Amino acid sequence: MLDAIKAAGLDSIAVGKIHDIFAGYGDTEYVYHKSNANGMEHATNYAAKDFHGLCFVNLVDFDMQYGHRRDIDGYANALTEFDAWLGDFVKGLGEDDIVLITADHGCDPAYTATTDHTREYVPLLVLGKNVKPGSMGTRKTFADIAATVTELLGVEYENPGQSFAKEIL
């Protein structure tokens, strides 16, 4: 998806460890961050710029600082901080901006049998001024997100996912 977005001449901005996860493939710009708060600051700064494409942000503290370490209070505090930031962030979105929030796996801080990833379904929240409210149910694959993002950006991209763009707009 990132390579297709970049090849289409659009911005493909990586914030956090996204650049490393994909070995630098497909990003047109990247910036690391030191914490969730710093990542949210970068997201706010990029949203204020006039760019066309994708800004892909990874807030790693949920996983590394709180989930794997089974720090329930830290996780709750991080969610509270993120929630407060998100409200302000969404208010500042442009008319056609869309935000997708998800996770790549579960990491329940209350599960103490192991510090490995846990097997919950992860949320998928879609926000924007023109996004229709509702439930999309359980998606079959993360590839649905790639199919949706590329469709919304008008980028040709073959993958096994099913776009949900028509469900949200």
Task: List PLM regions with ranges.
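Feature captures the catalytic ectodomains and active-site-proximal regions of enzymes
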Residues: M1-L169
